[in-house]
Amino acid sequence: MLAKRIVPCLDVKEGKVVKGVQFRNHEIVGDIVPLAARYAEEGADELVFYDITASAHDRVIDKSWVSRVAERIDIPFCVAGGIKTIAQAREKLAFGADKISINSPALTDPSLIERLQDEFGRQCIVIGIDSYFDAQSNSYKVKQFTGDEAATKDTQWFTQDWVQEVQKRGCGEIVLNVMNQDGVRQGYDLKQLSIVREICDVPLIASGGAGTMAHFKDVFEIARVDAALAASVFHKGIIDIGELKNYLFENSIAIRR
């Protein structure tokens, strides 16, 4: 059995790491490179960096901090934010990122997934999906440009349909960002993740809702995801990554230690 991964997420806005609740009301939590170094030292398996306003503001990730992170840490990391061309992706990989993630640009132009996969291989192409539960239709739907409240909009896609579409086009991993759960620390959306797991043939990363160590155990055991992403519990020191890994190991979860 492949080891499960613990993935701290660093949302970046105006050069700082920030964290909000349900993608809103972001507060500054620290500087990019020191936080990345701290999580690497604590035992994170990889890191994800989201420049949360890049797509909404029609710009791309600042490559300067990408190179500084690469110089400082020795674990894989993924970057996302406004990447919509082969050249932009190549630049981020050249500056040290191991993977690139696309979200809103893929919704605008789904063929981007195929072009990136053809150029770099599917192993480094991650698709982020911002999914929310729509009570009116009793279904999960996908939103776009979620890093800026004024720019956020609904899309035509139901989450399950978009999951199948991005796999068909060649993505290597999927991060399912459950907007309703984001930052509230009440647990991952096990129901939605379990539904997606049934139709997802690539590694699936859960995002949104971690508040206790038991939440990580549950998402691995019940939803059978490959990795669990979290932010506020790590930023605020609620959970130590090393202690979390020991807890998971003691509960028979295959984990790198």
Swiss-Prot record:
One of its GO terms (cellular component) is cytoplasm. Belongs to the HisA/HisF family. The active site is at D11, D130. The keyword Lyase applies. One of its GO terms (biological process) is L-histidine biosynthetic process. It is found in: Cytoplasm. Heterodimer of HisH and HisF. Keywords: Amino-acid biosynthesis, Cytoplasm, Histidine biosynthesis, Lyase. HAMAP family: HisF. GO terms for molecular function: imidazoleglycerol-phosphate synthase activity; lyase activity. PANTHER family: IMIDAZOLE GLYCEROL PHOSPHATE SYNTHASE HISHF, IMIDAZOLE GLYCEROL PHOSPHATE SYNTHASE SUBUNIT HISF/H IGP SYNTHASE SUBUNIT HISF/H. InterPro entries: Aldolase_TIM, His_biosynth, HisF, IGPS_HisA/HisF, RibuloseP-bd_barrel. The gene is hisF. It is an enzyme of class 4 (lyase). This is Imidazole glycerol phosphate synthase subunit HisF. It catalyses: 5-[(5-phospho-1-deoxy-D-ribulos-1-ylimino)methylamino]-1-(5-phospho-beta-D-ribosyl)imidazole-4-carboxamide + L-glutamine = D-erythro-1-(imidazol-4-yl)glycerol 3-phosphate + 5-amino-1-(5-phospho-beta-D-ribosyl)imidazole-4-carboxamide + L-glutamate + H(+). Pathway: Amino-acid biosynthesis; L-histidine biosynthesis; L-histidine from 5-phospho-alpha-D-ribose 1-diphosphate: step 5/9. Its EC number is 4.3.2.10. IGPS catalyzes the conversion of PRFAR and glutamine to IGP, AICAR and glutamate. The HisF subunit catalyzes the cyclization activity that produces IGP and AICAR from PRFAR using the ammonia provided by the HisH subunit. Its main location: cytoplasm.
